[in-house]
């Protein structure tokens, strides 16, 4: 064994061994308990970043640990390979998205191997291959036949100059990112999947997910947004149709003083025919894309349509306004406004001088003061005719019942969740498998024409999708009739909604899933990824699982038992102000810093001498130029060091602060482990350990070894607090470094301890552990070695610490045998100098003894 730890030599050797032996390839094995450990698949952007490294290290630690417990562990990896960035990169680099993507996959695959992740590479998949997306296309046609897919018009961002649809991220300050033209909202036909048909199940089954973070579950609950309320119909004077609104607060109905409709509502459109101000307002709304998240903070605007609705219970005429806070795609596109008891309605009414009528008493029974804001709390009704004096629940039911009896109301359950629009007017995605015949009939692409293959050898002009630009591509024949293919492609969330299931049978040719393999491996035991995916991906992932279950492919209700959301990786961020006042961000690698005695940065400059402003730690990002390249760190310190730092620096679900000093610390620790094994093995063979013949000191050290095994097992397995597991191993290493190594049994004990340490570190730092296991002559490869088991007998304490008090004041702490009698403890206490001093010349009046813990001598 060489004396120095040289990761650059051992890591590539061990990785080659894993490759040649196919160590991590698995097949279904009914005789073993399975464990499916999955990290969210990466987008092949070109290089791994530290966020990836953290995500995949956590997954690998768990997978390797479960494997050492004797389970059949599946840990696959693949590539979420479709998506918009590839189109931009292709234009920039004068290539096509496909070769750019495949080059990136090859490069990043080598980076993953360099980090030593134990993946089953035989299951690798890329979502941009027809072998993968053909099954998604087939499944979509099945969903269409089941009535779960439909087409309707929906608004998109449209650039009139480029004549193209823009993704939300391509709209910068309301303008096209390419040509700076003002973006319009345009209605175009798009495909939708009925996720709303599963809303109740998606909501209720959250209760089954005991091992998902509460934050994620509550985000999904809010996103689904189930509410119970009443749908109310209003007659409108001089208008051919009625207006329908939905409210969750029918108890406030007598305080409704106006209605508001979306700018795109037919009533607003009709009113605008003779109202130029309203027409201009509708135009303005059409070209302002409003994300629902921004609704709360944006300025509320509106125009009176001139129409009057009739309040069904009071007969009063109330105005109908067009307002920018009502969205056509939500509910009925119309809302009732109760400005006395809803803050948004209050602000709008105050701005435009509309009537504000209070109908709920304040908590103390007085009339509410509405001079500054609305009273939004529930309470007792007044000003409400026959409903006066009713509390919230009674009023809710009485008014709902009355409206229902009159035929103008209906109790309804509503959802915030909208159906999933899966059409994208982009090129680099899976083609949507639908065709339109000459007579206008729309139908799914027949099975014998699947997959609809996306041509990869294309020229990108950066504006129009190549399959839209080429009229020949869309032409096909169905049942002998000419037809046109759909030229939109799927939302890339489609591919990432079922990849986890395809990993169980990536080569299967007969269908989307081989049920036997899928049901052996699924559900996923632990799924690891960022919390930013809480609603979109993780909701579609759950939805798709239920769709596949209802198609008879899987027999479980949920795709993953446990979800672990890792924290972000932060790094120092620095900038200097340029000549034009712009911020130039400087990589922390290039910052020369001065620190105070507490280690805080007080001054910084770069190599060119610019004074740098230090903005603290923030998420690693391109925009702040504070990403640290994992490859550079692996080349400098080795993969094991980077992995160890990642797992030690912070709990897995908290943010991690990247500090190179911490990386150096992890590296020093691994050098110490190497050195101890080197010194131990240099002394030659080791005798067998004789547990019964150990000295007290040897017993104490062995107790520490086995207590550490018990703690690390609990920390990794049950608690998943990996940082505390590593801390416990480090603490044990400090004790081993000081332990005597001269006697035969000292060395036998050291052998037992080091074999345990190397196995406990193996999930974190597998290359060094593989090598040290061989040097220690461990049985077989460490990859097939069992996890160490704590010896209960070794952990039994044979002595205990007793606190000695005189008149309730602590005077000594003494170590006594566990089975010592009260007399023996008193005798031992009397030998302590301080205790003897306080007992000198006084009488002990009373003795309080708590066996093995406390001795209190009361004197006087």
UniProtKB/Swiss-Prot annotation:
Known EC number: 6.1.1.4
Pfam families xrefs: Anticodon_1 (PF08264), tRNA-synt_1 (PF00133), tRNA-synt_1_2 (PF13603), tRNA-synt_1g (PF09334)
Catalytic activity, reaction form: tRNA(Leu) + L-leucine + ATP = L-leucyl-tRNA(Leu) + AMP + diphosphate
Binding site for ATP: 622
One of the protein's GO biological processes: leucyl-tRNA aminoacylation
Keyword Cytoplasm in record: yes
Cellular compartments annotated: Cytoplasm
GO cellular component terms attached to this protein's record: cytosol
Intervals of motif 'KMSKS' region: 619-623
Family: Belongs to the class-I aminoacyl-tRNA synthetase family.
Protein name: Leucine--tRNA ligase
Gene: leuS
